[in-house]
Amino acid sequence: MKVLVIGCGRVGSAVSLQLRAAGWDVSVIDENEDALGRLGDDWTGEFHVGHGMDIQLLRTAGIEDADAVVVTTDGDNSNIVIGQMAQKNFGVRSVIVRILDPARADFFKTRGLDVVCPTQSAIETLTTAVRAVEGALA
């Protein structure tokens, strides 16, 4: 299976390393060449320097053969646009996008993107933890 990961920060690099360890063919794009260091000296996947909206770079990185695309840059707008490009321009069936803004996350879920919203996950986890305290004190 082949995955293209766009964004190699803390999340993107961890996803890339875990998928590579599980036997996936992993190709990574990041604007910062130094991000390759997050993958370690023994990285055996591909790494491409550039912007995830660059159509030629997406092709070079293998988007046309990708079974999945994971978009984890540091900007919601970029992640949304790149995710939509992967779906509409390249026909990638499994596109997972990190969106930090819960309102945007809900909206783009209805547009066919698989959305991960860590902000919403944190809100739900924290609220559940507080309610558990309430129940323990009753």
Can you say where each PLM-predicted feature lies in the sequence?
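Cytosolic regulatory regions of ion transport systems
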Residues: 1-138
